[in-house]
Amino acid sequence: GALTPVITPLQAAPARDSRRLQLEHLHTEEQLSLVYAIGNNYLPSATQLLDRFLRDHYSQEIGRIDLRLFDLLHQIQQILGCQQPFQVISGFRSPATNDQLRANGTGGVARNSLHMSGRAIDIRLAEIPLTDLRDAAMLLKAGGVGYYSQEQFVHIDTGKVRYW
């Protein structure tokens, strides 16, 4: 089969209060597993890798991802007691890509999408029911949660608390 690119930063053994994320991108087939924060400190080298990993997979444009989005993902994994990687459908989206997806009639693409400001991500977990993922995100009351059962993903963002 095809080789899957893996990005792995060199790191010391993780501290007790470290926060880790494991992601696999369904479009680029890249995988990433790293500690992105220790205590109140975000690790710039790790957040830069996350920004690149969650780039617009159509244009390759890299946006700056809201650090709170990483924490939401980490908290969801804690709630679900799950160690498996999040499967990423969409992270950052350039305005041009967003307009193109809207023009193509792709469902659920908002004109002022928070994907364009690095404040939204569309994800799923292979072994976890989509409804459980949605419920865990809603439990946090930390932003928007969209449930797309047909498309098999949950949208999570750091905007106003709202559900659809």
Question: Which residues make up each language-model segment?
Answer:
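Catalytic cores and adjacent binding grooves of peptidoglycan-active enzymes
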Residues: 19-24, 105-164
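Structured segments of extracytoplasmic/periplasmic soluble domains
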Residues: 26, 35, 53-56, 72-83, ...
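Cleaved targeting-peptide boundary
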Residues: 11-18
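Active-site acidic/histidine clusters and adjacent loop/turn architecture
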Residues: 35-89
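Acidic helix-start/capping segments at beta-turn-to-alpha-helix junctions
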Residues: 85-99
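N-terminal export signals
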Residues: 1-11
